[in-house]
Amino acid sequence: MSLRKKAAASVIAIAATFSLAACGGNDEDVIKVGTTDQGQEQWQVFQEEAKAQGLNLELVPFSDYSLPNRALEEGQIDVNNFQHLMFLADYNVNSDANLTPIGATEIIPLALYFKDHSELKDVEEAGEVAIPNDPTNQGRALHMLANAGLLELKDKSLLSPTPADVDTAKSKVKVTPVDAAQTVTSYPDGTPSVINNSFLSNGNIDPKSAVAQDDPSAPAAEPFINAFVTTEERKDDEDLKKLVDVWHSQKVQDAIDRQTEGTSVEVKKDGKELDEILTGIEGKIKDAK
């Protein structure tokens, strides 16, 4: 099946997922947490550890990055944990929203995978790379591929470049934007793919098998700090803040380490620190318009 047909089929599945999520109950004692990688081990451990702290959680799964923030704004969930600050800034600016980070979790590398291959020259020979099509992860993917020497950007200073910013004449590969969840299904078909860590388990992909990746510990990675996010009205909710502490508990961190094969970098920053970073990113996005 072609990448385009797969992306179209994914839209149908996404719509069904959102409909189911929107039909949930309204038990005020339950904290609804939106995520895109519920099947990963750390979420079960997180839910158990939260329960031990007197917090009853319902994990609400989404199969597309565009939905958890919309669900948060519409009151279908109380908080989400799936996105980095760059993604949140882009959403806030382009949706005229004011969603707020309340605590950092980690930075996870964005990496390039190619089934049964481990060298960049193999990717060059393939000639095509599937990348996430959401603006922020797409831009991050393009910067990563440029740093790996696979493509050339016309302007390397762009915060979130698009495929139109690629100098195709000087590049060794072409890029095909697809839904982020679709990158993992492109991988077994023999297409080199830039895949977010949250989808690796769906394709039984070893995080350490990456052909190339960005550096999550570098200062330039700060916009890609992942965080718990809620609405402006609930940013001081003590129960929601407790979730951040639970996430940084040893048992949850051990589960994350196992899941990511030690590739993620834990980050401890509070809502105020994150908001300062977020404000700066939002300003750059607005200036680029």
Question: Could you tell me what each predicted segment is?
Answer:
Residues 18-22:
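C-terminal motif of bacterial Sec signal peptides marking the signal peptidase cleavage site
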Residues 28-38, 55-61, 127-129:
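Short, well-ordered beta-strand elements
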Residues 31, 38-42, 52, 190, ...:
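An extracytoplasmic/periplasmic, membrane-proximal ligand-sensing/linker region
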Residues 59-70, 157-185:
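Short helix-initiation/N-cap motifs at beta->coil->alpha
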Residues 64-65, 75-89, 106, 179-180, ...:
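Beta->alpha turn/N-cap motifs
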Residues 90-102, 117, 189, 194, ...:
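Ligand-binding "clamshell"
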Residues 102-152:
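A conserved helix-loop-strand patch within extracytoplasmic ligand-binding domains
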Residues 109-121, 224-242:
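A bilobed periplasmic-binding-protein/Venus flytrap-type ligand-binding module shared by bacterial periplasmic
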